[in-house]
């Protein structure tokens, strides 16, 4: 079911128009938000992706990452940073900044 919802919204195809989940008509009490909720494995993959981005871009301020996530990664990085991964990412950025000052 989760794969079908992702397919219908074109979430995994960068070449197709992205539909909003709020516009999806559902039947039988299906909870789209619950189906699209990130698993622990998904969250760890996204955190890894953010850390790689931080290193590649030389990010030394949390605000820079939040601004990027809000503008370009609103559906995956932004909620993760707002809900439960900000601490580990902030500490990673802070340690990078401290390391580069030495």
Curated annotation (Swiss-Prot):
Belongs to the Gram-positive plasmids replication protein type 2 family. InterPro entries: Plasmid_rep_OBD, RepB_C. It comes from the Bacteria. GO terms for biological process: DNA replication. Keywords: Plasmid. It comes from Staphylococcus aureus. It holds the Pfam family Rep_OBD. GO terms for cellular component: extrachromosomal circular DNA. The keyword Transferase does not apply. This is Uncharacterized 12.4 kDa protein. GO terms for molecular function: DNA binding; DNA topoisomerase activity.
